[in-house]
């Protein structure tokens, strides 16, 4: 919406998100499924990860008549939509309603509580299926390597958001009086705003670069400040202070130097009885047989990995922009390529075109 020309001409963009939500809700409210399923092909595809990319891939493959088995590490499908969107941004049950609607096409089975390297073996999946799609997301969290991060009250923001989404009563969740959030992305904004809504007296987001470098949109930043969240830029954490539990966080002001970000030597402290780390997520549990790029699974434009018969998409794959809509598109496009490969006979790919096997 920020790129909409009406934002400049009229000061308000076309509200694409709300239009899509209305269209989706209207379609899901109707009886029956709008997409027909093709005649069964007898082909079986394994999808690992029941997030936006995995579910989009499974749905498109089912449309083509293939049997799809979806594995997911968590007890409820939905991925980011179920565990990663703050409670104040959504309504209860929407993610599960979408999953049920997707499964309505038929031909898709879910198996919960199973993850790669923890019960699932990639070689076995390849052997037992005609193709494998990996949509495992980013399950790891970047480490904050400073003194005091092991103190009570220092938590991962992604786990906080997940706990909120699964809680039956938000009032049962303990929240600090003075909350500090380290990071500059959407998760940082969500943790900060949700903390204010749950009753925190002061909430401060601290980001190491300027606000123009925050990955959270300006709209999200303004939303946070409108809720009483303070944003401090050009500062990085030095240490967490406390005796068993966090009491303060010490920060150092930063500046952009010739060699990159550098500290100025000037420090300050913020009172805190709860600190949320929101400094990014990492790939976790991906098989070593795959090739990687920038900390993600390396794929080509069709989602093919370096391992024959294995595709990947969504946040776990290289080249994306970490948006849900992009993950859905990558899952859908990979499904089309999988369909062609296993049914039309295009599974033989020139090794020189595979990621990581370029000549020279």
Regions found by a protein language model. Give the residues of each.
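Iron-sulfur cluster-binding cysteine motifs and their immediate structural context
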Residues: 1-23, 69, 73-76, 107-108
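Rossmann-like dinucleotide-binding cores of NAD(P)H-dependent redox enzymes
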Residues: 67-70, 74-104, 108-112, 192-239, ...
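N-terminal Rossmann-like FAD-binding beta1-loop-alpha1 element of flavoenzymes
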Residues: 43-69, 187-196
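A conserved FAD-binding loop/helix module that cradles the flavin
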Residues: 191, 316-345
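Feature captures the FAD/FMN-dependent oxidoreductase FAD-binding
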Residues: 39-40, 44-48, 96-147, 239-250, ...
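Glycine-rich dinucleotide-binding loop and its adjacent helix/turn
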Residues: 23-39, 100-113, 118, 141-198, ...
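Residue-level detector of alpha-helix initiation sites
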Residues: 51-52, 76, 185-187, 317
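FAD-site-proximal beta/loop scaffold in flavoenzymes
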Residues: 150-176, 259-322, 337
